[in-house]
């Protein structure tokens, strides 16, 4: 029940972020978002974002104090932003697999597990799968690391993040529309 509420909240937040009307548009006209983006900065949190903003303000050298400068990262200008508690079932310091599961499904799981329950028997439906199935959205993954790595493997349902070959097989069967990234790891299954 709690997981369903979290999934619904994540979906609502994603849709709200993209549905904010453009300037001049009537506020009472509902708009369906054309695109929904979910950015995951692996290991990133508010201190990293704020430090990057301070750094960029410092190198701009506009004479303003970096702590009071009005200049902001583009991602800090979004009208709606959210965060999630991505600790997992077993650890306060989780890994990429369980945090990706928390973000994509609203469920907690064991470290090292991608989109499956703690017994590693039941697959969780991801927000990307729901958006595609229920609303007809296209889905894609863009990554700077291999596409069968735990974080970009949003499409997979595996008991172990180290099942690179099986994760790659799920990529093919995922029905996602676009993939781009750092290749695949262990493509032969050996």
Describe these PLM feature segments.
Residues 11, 15-19:
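Hydrophobic core
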Residues 1-10:
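Bacterial N-terminal signal peptides that target proteins for export
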Residues 18-29:
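Sec-dependent signal peptide cleavage junction
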Residues 28-190:
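N-terminal catalytic scaffold of extracellular/periplasmic and nuclease hydrolases
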């Amino acid at each position: 029940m709690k997981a369903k509420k979290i999934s619904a909240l994540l979906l609502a937040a994603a849709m709200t972020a993209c549905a904010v009307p453009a300037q001049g548009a009537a506020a009472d006209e509902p708009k369906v978002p054309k695109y929904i983006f979910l950015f995951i900065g692996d290991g990133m949190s508010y201190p990293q974002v704020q430090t990057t903003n301070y750094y960029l303000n410092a190198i701009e050298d506009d004479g303003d104090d970096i702590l009071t400068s009005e200049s902001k990262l583009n991602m800090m200008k979004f009208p709606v932003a959210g965060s999630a508690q991505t600790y997992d079932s077993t650890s306060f310091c989780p890994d990429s697999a369980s945090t990706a599961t928390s973000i994509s499904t609203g469920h907690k799981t064991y470290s090292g597990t991608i989109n499956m329950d703690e017994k590693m028997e039941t697959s969780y439906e991801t927000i990307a799968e729901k958006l595609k199935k229920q609303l007809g959205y296209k889905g894609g993954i863009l990554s700077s690391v291999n596409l069968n790595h735990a974080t970009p493997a949003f499409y997979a349902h595996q008991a172990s993040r180290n099942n690179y070959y099986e994760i790659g097989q799920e990529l093919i069967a995922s029905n996602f529309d676009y993939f781009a990234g750092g290749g695949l790891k262990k493509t032969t299954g050996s």
